[in-house]
């Protein structure tokens, strides 16, 4: 089992796809890494030699911020925006869309499930 940046890559997938299971590595970055290390993208993860895994691990850990480091960096950037009181920081703090999207309708992903508002009670009939 290939373990890179603290993530176990799925054994039966191609290396090109398997690398995308690491937070911070998408398909294009995966292709860059494979080109830099000279590993064939069509190779299955289970067929990688120890040397290939070591080369991939070295490339990822030396040249890219991934997993915990990247998550920490993103959290620090958001915290900085909140601390200095920017508009974007306020939107993050309030849990609303940050990039100018409308909120009168939509924005459900960012705002969460719709909360039920109690309606007017009907008067008891006579």
Curated annotation (Swiss-Prot):
Name by which UniProt lists this protein: Small ribosomal subunit protein uS13
GO CC annotations, alphabetized: cytosol; small ribosomal subunit
Per its UniProt record, what PROSITE patterns does this chain match? RIBOSOMAL_S13_1, RIBOSOMAL_S13_2
**Disordered: where is this region?**
92-126
Give the intrachain disulfide bonds. none
Annotated family:
Belongs to the universal ribosomal protein uS13 family.
**Chain coiled-coil ranges:** none
Swiss-Prot/TrEMBL keywords: Ribonucleoprotein, Ribosomal protein, RNA-binding, rRNA-binding, tRNA-binding
> Per the UniProt entry, what species is this protein from, by scientific name?
Trichormus variabilis (strain ATCC 29413 / PCC 7937) (Anabaena variabilis)
Citing just one GO molecular function, the answer is: rRNA binding
Describe the subunit structure: Part of the 30S ribosomal subunit. Forms a loose heterodimer with protein S19. Forms two bridges to the 50S subunit in the 70S ribosome.
């Amino acid at each position: 089992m290939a373990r890179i940046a603290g993530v176990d890559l799925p054994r039966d997938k191609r290396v090109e796809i398997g690398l995308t299971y690491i937070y911070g590595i998408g398909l294009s970055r995966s292709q860059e890494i494979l080109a830099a290390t000279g590993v064939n993208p069509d190779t299955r993860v289970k067929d990688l030699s120890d040397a290939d895994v070591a080369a991939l691990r070295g490339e990822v850990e030396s040249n890219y911020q991934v997993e915990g480091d990247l998550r920490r960096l993103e959290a620090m950037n958001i915290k900085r925006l909140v601390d200095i009181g920017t508009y974007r920081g306020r939107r993050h703090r309030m849990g609303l869309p940050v990039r100018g999207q409308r909120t009168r309708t939509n924005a459900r992903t960012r705002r969460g499930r719709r909360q039920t508002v109690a309606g007017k009670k009907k008067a008891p009939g006579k």
